[in-house]
C-alpha cells in the first residue's frame, strides 16, 4: 500500500501469527488529517473492540462503516450469519454500519459466475440488515465487469479491485515468509 502512496499505520504484531489487539500511538494521527482515513477492523468483533476505543474521536465526525461480506467466508455463508456477525461488530465497536460491500471471492479461484451469483446473497443480507449495497467488487486481474454482466443484469455498481494482500503461503520467498523479515 505504501508503494501507491497510502500511509499505513499498523500494530506491532501485524503480519504475524499473533492476534493481539495492540494499537500504536501513531494511530491517533489518523483522526487529525484533513483527508480520508480508512480503518480495517477485521471481520469480527475482536478487531471491532479495538476500534471501539476510538469512539470519542469518531462519533462527532462524518463517517461510513462499510460491512464487507464474502459469501465464501466461513461464519457468514448465509444471510443470518452475516447479520449476527454485523451485530457483534457494531456492539463491540459502538458504531453502526452504513453500507454493505459485496466482496465475495476465492482469490485466484474466483470467476465471473461466482461474482454474479453472490449478488443474490448480498441482496438478502441488504434486506435483512436494512443497509444499501454500495458495490460488488471483482478482481480486475482476472475479469472485467462485462464478464460478470454476461450472466445477467446487475443493478449495483461493479467495482474493480487490485489485490495487494497475500496469504502466508503466497508470500514465501527463498524459503522464508516475507512477514518474518519485517
List each model region and its residues.
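N-terminal phosphate/diphosphate-binding loop that engages ATP/GTP or pyrophosphate donors
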Residues: 1-19, 26, 152
Amino acid at each position: 500500500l505504501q508503494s501507491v502512496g497510502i500511509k499505513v499505520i499498523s500494530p506491532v504484531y501485524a503480519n504475524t501469527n499473533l492476534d493481539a489487539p495492540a494499537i500504536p500511538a501513531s494511530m491517533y494521527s489518523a483522526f487529525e488529517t484533513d483527508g480520508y482515513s480508512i480503518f480495517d477492523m477485521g471481520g469480527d468483533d475482536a478487531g471491532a473492540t479495538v476500534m471501539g476505543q476510538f469512539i470519542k474521536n469518531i462519533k462527532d465526525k462524518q463517517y461510513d462503516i462499510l460491512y464487507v461480506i464474502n459469501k465464501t467466508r466461513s461464519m457468514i455463508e448465509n444471510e443470518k450469519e452475516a447479520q449476527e456477525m454485523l451485530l457483534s461488530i457494531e456492539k463491540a465497536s459502538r458504531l453502526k454500519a452504513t453500507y454493505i460491500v459485496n466482496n465475495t471471492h476465492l482469490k485466484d479461484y474466483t470467476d465471473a459466475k461466482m461474482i454474479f451469483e453472490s449478488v443474490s446473497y448480498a441482496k438478502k443480507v441488504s434486506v435483512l440488515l436494512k443497509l444499501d449495497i454500495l458495490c460488488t467488487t471483482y478482481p480486475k486481474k482476472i475479469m472485467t465487469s462485462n464478464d460478470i454482466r454476461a450472466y445477467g443484469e446487475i443493478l449495483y455498481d461493479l467495482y474493480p479491485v487490485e489485490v495487494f494482500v497475500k496469504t502466508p503461503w503466497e508470500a514465501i520467498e527463498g524459503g522464508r515468509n516475507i512477514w518474518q523479515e519485517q
